[in-house]
């Protein structure tokens, strides 16, 4: 919403309580300055050690749920900064993973993940890897292996801590007898991050857990590709490795016990609002803040797909981020990468890892998709990338 104008802060946009950062990434250990903490409308000083954002964010979320004493519906948005860079984690969590990544390396782990995904039914057993963009594990020096294994262990520790704290929040819902009637939507905003696109990671490994750091170090392009197994590319890009993330949905009171059930109908971020509106029976407003007109609701509720009443929620789905463009229609997906001059076309049902560009074989499909993307971009004020000076 924006951190530089207080009128855009959460309490001025409809929330009753807020704790967290108004910026993007921050130090997990000592958020401060322009990337510091805010409680409601009050900027907070840098916290004293020991402090860890994932624990603190969850603890405040639990406090806010505990404060909700009546039976009115509540909406809680818990946005962890983990596992975004910088690499900050608790040492006891890091030690759980260090030996695993050093012993096996990224080639073996990538293959094991692909096999496990196929066994679980997440991907077809014949799904091929996207092209590997890094060195093989055996080509690294022993020192490089030590350093990158440690980076990945820190990243895994960040994810582990998120998992632990979600468990704490679920325990809180159960304690307050709210679990069965609470719709939980858990998702990531994008695929794994390769920034700054260096194979072994950005920043020095000695900077891990430096409280003063809000940016480096990172875990690197190679581990990001492992995290995105078996898909192509990373965060910011419009290939599946950038945009395809799982959504875990739970609502025992309304949906029953669907633990482990898969829904394979594609959806995307605009579907979250309609899903919540259907769940709560709320009405999407037409105006806000003194009569300012709100743009019409886009997206579709996910419930028809969850209940297996449809195998398609959208005629088209659209993406644009940092001049990376994509559109999906039926089995087809057209992409124009920021680094590419031409649109590409993939059959993402037969070729989920986008290995075979079939634009030349299906020009009529590509023309249709590009034309529709341009219409959508114009209607939604998507700006072209400004040329560098």
What are the language-model segments listed below?
Residues 1-6, 21-25, 76-88, 129-137, ...:
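Short, solvent-exposed turn/loop segments enriched in Gly/Ser/Thr/Pro and often Arg
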Residues 61, 75-78, 247-249, 276, ...:
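A short aromatic-rich beta-strand->coil structural motif
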Residues 5-14, 88-89, 171-251, 257-258:
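Histidine-centered active-site microenvironments of extracellular/periplasmic hydrolases
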Residues 61, 74-80, 159-162, 166-169, ...:
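Beta-strand elements within well-structured catalytic alpha/beta cores of enzymes
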